[in-house]
Regions:
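Internal "kinase-insert"/substrate-recognition segments embedded within catalytic cores
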Residues: 133-134, 148, 170-173, 186-298, ...
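Sec-dependent bacterial lipoprotein signal peptides
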Residues: 1-15
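Conserved NTP-binding catalytic cores of kinases and kinase-like/nucleotidyltransferase enzymes
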Residues: 54-156, 160
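Bacterial Sec-dependent N-terminal signal peptides
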Residues: 14-54, 462
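Structural recognition of the beta-strand scaffold that forms the well-ordered cores
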Residues: 124-128, 143-148, 155, 163, ...
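Middle-to-C-terminal accessory/interaction subdomains
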Residues: 105, 116, 120, 244-309, ...
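Short, well-structured beta-strand/strand-turn elements
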Residues: 168-180, 304
């Protein structure tokens, strides 16, 4: 009788979308409870759901296992552009060994990405379904991303950081689902299916017209995208900013484009001025400081040099007087882990040195391998309370870094061994994924010890 009840409950769980995304095997250190957001955003009750979704006899829980996705464009049209006007109508079919996750429907597909689209043969894609749907157990939406992870020889870099953010309670985390893609009859290899970072009930759940979702991104900013109508230079730190929400269609409804960009610039400028003054008490009134600290510690731990550019750095704020600016979602981490930029067009080299810093040994004074990191990310190190909070938080999460976060990411690799081998045959490179995963683990362990010293010795601030 107990087994009947158990399997009945599991069937219900598998059809519901998962925000917590917990797997079968318990982590060595239990995940900390997800804190109640202080930014006025709404959370899905599933975010703290720790129920298992597979019977104990299954080696890997459903979320780790590899599904098969077949995409056929109408008339066999090639997917050879990332331009929004070049979406190709298509039929999408997903086959999973979790039967309730099988899917077939209509949608559109195009390319996506910047360097990943321009430099590499294995291309990433953006999918837009005709109708919202839950894909492989994730919350229903129309927009999905297929990350090629071609540069990353481990295929785990984004997955690790997504898991870290989720388990630390950074709002609106992305999730990983493995799929092997066949596009117009051509086997394309192993891809990471994940959510599109965007405004939405099951994405970044902020007000569609009065909330803000911004990205600090050189590629989408005024210098490299001068003709775009959704970007600006920030007032204080002169960072390239792209307005992701409200979108263009909503801008026209709400107010003139020029006025809305001006409002975004002013709203962000108010936050910038507080950071410039490194006033901790004032910052707490407008920014979710605990999330900011977690976000920046993750960036340093994985040595994400994109902070310096900056690229793919998101920040959001809901409507309402009590809403706080909140860092995240976390996105795009194959430029971390000591990537060899000397071979950026064709290389897959990582993990050579764990002793470099992006924010720095003394962030306030830019004592770092990247001394041009925008001071927006480092000026708060001038405040003693902020520095004290950073040190305390690292001490708190440090045991989980190697005992919980890495083992969780590793499960995805263990479940995808055969698919990774097929991917390696389809897209051969000068690296063996098993060797690189072992190197990644050693690098992360050494990096954590290095971070212990860095964080402990941060100057105390004023």
């Amino acid at each position: 009788m107990k087994k009947i009840i158990l399997f009945g409950l599991m069937a219900l769980l598998m059809v519901a979308c998962s925000s917590s995304d917990d797997g079968l095997e318990p982590s060595p250190v239990p995940p900390a409870p997800v804190p109640t957001p202080t930014d006025g955003t709404k959370t899905d009750s599933a975010k703290t759901d720790t129920a298992k979704t597979e019977p104990e006899t299954v080696k890997f829980a459903a979320k780790y296992r590899v599904a098969k996705m077949t995409i056929t464009t109408d008339g066999g049209q090639a997917v050879d552009s990332k331009d929004k006007k070049d979406y190709r109508a298509c039929t999408i079919k997903i086959e999973s060994d979790t039967a309730v996750w099988n899917y077939e429907g209509r949608g559109r597909i195009r390319g996506r990405g910047n360097s990943t689209w321009e430099w590499y043969d294995k291309k990433p894609y953006r999918i837009k379904l005709d109708e919202k749907a839950s894909i492989l157990g994730l919350c229903e939406e129309k927009d999905w991303v297929l990350l090629a992870n071609f540069r990353d020889p481990t295929k785990l870099m984004n997955t690790l950081v997504f898991e870290m953010g989720d388990r630390l309670g950074i709002p609106y985390p992305n999730h990983t689902r493995w799929i092997e893609l066949t596009l117009n009859g051509d086997y394309m290899g192993l891809y990471q299916l994940t959510e599109q970072v965007e405004q939405g009930k099951n994405r970044v759940n902020i007000d569609k017209k009065a909330g803000w979702l911004l990205s600090f991104d050189s590629d989408d900013g005024p210098e490299l995208s001068p003709g775009a109508d959704d970007n600006f230079w920030s007032q204080v730190y002169r960072m390239p900013v792209c307005v992701k929400s409200p979108e263009i269609s909503e801008k026209i409804e709400v107010k003139s484009e020029k006025s809305l960009i001006g409002d975004a610039k002013k709203a962000l400028g108010d936050l910038e001025n507080i950071i410039l003054s490194h006033d901790y008490e004032a910052l707490k009134q407008v920014c979710n400081v605990p999330v900011m600290i977690d976000y920046l510690l993750i960036q340093e731990y994985i040595y994400n040099v994109e902070v310096a550019a900056p690229r793919s750095i998101f920040i959001h704020k809901d409507s309402g007087d009590d809403a706080l600016w909140t860092f995240g979602p976390l996105w795009d981490f194959d430029a971390g882990f000591d990537f060899d930029w000397g071979h950026m067009y064709d290389g897959h080299g990582y993990f050579a040195d764990y002793r470099e810093t992006v924010l720095g040994t003394d962030p306030a004074r830019h004592i770092s391998n990247y001394d041009y990191v925008p001071s927006f990310f480092t000026d708060m190190w001038k405040d003693k309370t902020f520095v004290s909070e950073v040190k305390a938080r690292w001490k708190q999460i440090r045991p989980r870094v190697t005992a919980e976060f890495w083992p969780e990411a590793k499960r995805y690799a263990d479940a995808a061994t055969e698919a990774m081998e097929r991917d390696a045959k389809r897209w051969p490179i000068d690296k063996q994924y098993k060797t690189e995963i072992n190197r990644m683990e050693k690098w992360l362990n050494a990096r954590a010890v290095f971070m212990d010293n860095i964080v402990t010795n941060y100057p105390n601030g004023n």
